[in-house]
Design a protein with these regions (language model features):
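C-terminal motif of bacterial Sec signal peptides marking the signal peptidase cleavage site
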Residues: 20-23
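Mature extracellular/secreted ectodomains of secretory-pathway proteins
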Residues: 80-81, 87, 91-206
Length: 300
């Protein structure tokens, strides 16, 4: 299985220009430019002793980031694996810009209570990635990423360097939550399991692609409920906590009823449809490459 976010922003590589300089002969004492001559009769001067070259400064190579193990990938995605597909897509893309996450969270703290129009006006001139701007509509998610910068950065690196294993880990955890009876359709969300018809095998996968995948969508197209759950309980196995990850304020169990997955107030996303960071510009396509025409406007 080769899952894809259906909105990819590609960064170009800078070109390095090498500028050379032409050597010039030095003027003599009378200010005349000396000309090289193969038949010059001037006695050769005593060669200047060659000075030992100054050793070049040692270049310290930056070690490549270690590839997370399968167990580490489970631990890394456990807090967000049960998010609705479109929100998960935004979180993964935004995690590749941890500095922008911090800047946006700081802006919202300094300007609390912005209505939809004021929020859009504040976001439009910012040079942030569309995924980061989109999370402004989900302040609890944004704040969680901001207060756990080490986890956020690790999530972004894993998505950039090993997205296949990362997304396979998401599906493994979703399937385990389904098997435990905790992940299911509710008035807030629709959960659908589908069988993979065409299996794509990638050499060296740390997390084998599952035979089925689980989609999570809002029950109402324009109202999103962000799930709250304890990763140590909802999957039937405790994968531990990623170093530097801090749970939401108030823990995981305040006000829950009817299961291990709770929901707060619904977030209306209809007002954001016409903006490039709006909810419907994001999506997730499981089980293979995205269909033709998915492009930058997302796959629905």
């Amino acid at each position: 299985m080769s899952p894809h976010l259906t909105r990819r922003l590609l960064a170009g590589l800078p070109l390095l220009a090498v500028i050379g300089s032409n050597g010039c002969s030095a003027p003599d004492r009378d200010g005349n430019q000396a000309a090289a001559s193969p038949t010059a009769t001037t006695p050769a001067s005593v060669p200047t002793p060659i000075q030992p070259a100054t050793p070049a400064a040692a270049v310290t190579a930056t070690p490549a980031a270690a590839v997370p193990s399968a167990a580490e990938l489970y631990r890394l995605v456990a807090p967000v694996a049960l998010f609705p597909d479109r929100l998960l897509a935004q979180v993964l893309a935004a995690a590749t810009h941890p500095d922008q996450i911090a800047a946006e969270a700081d802006m919202l703290r300094q300007n609390p209570g912005l209505n939809a129009a004021a929020l859009q006006a504040a976001l439009t001139p910012q040079p942030w990635d569309p995924a980061v701007k989109g999370l402004a509509s989900f302040p609890d998610v944004l704040n969680q990423m901001d207060r756990s910068p080490a986890w956020t950065a690790a999530l972004g690196r894993a998505y950039t360097s090993d997205s296949t294993d990362l997304m396979n880990a998401v599906q493994v955890l979703r399937q385990r939550a389904v098997n435990q009876g905790h992940l299911k359709s509710t008035p807030q969300q629709t959960v659908v399991s589908r069988t993979v018809t065409t299996q794509t095998v990638t050499s060296g996968e740390l997390v084998p692609a599952p035979q089925s995948y689980v989609e999570i969508e809002p029950a109402q197209p324009d109202v999103v409920y962000v799930p709250s759950y304890n990763p140590a309980l909802v999957y039937g196995e405790d994968y531990g906590v990623w170093p530097g990850y801090y749970e939401a304020d108030g823990g995981f169990d305040a006000g829950w009823s009817g299961g291990l997955i709770g929901f707060g107030a619904g977030i209306a996303v209809g007002a954001l449809l016409s903006h490039p960071w709006g909810w419907h510009h994001w999506g997730m396509h499981w089980g293979g490459p995205p269909p033709p025409g998915a492009g930058m406007d997302g796959w629905r």
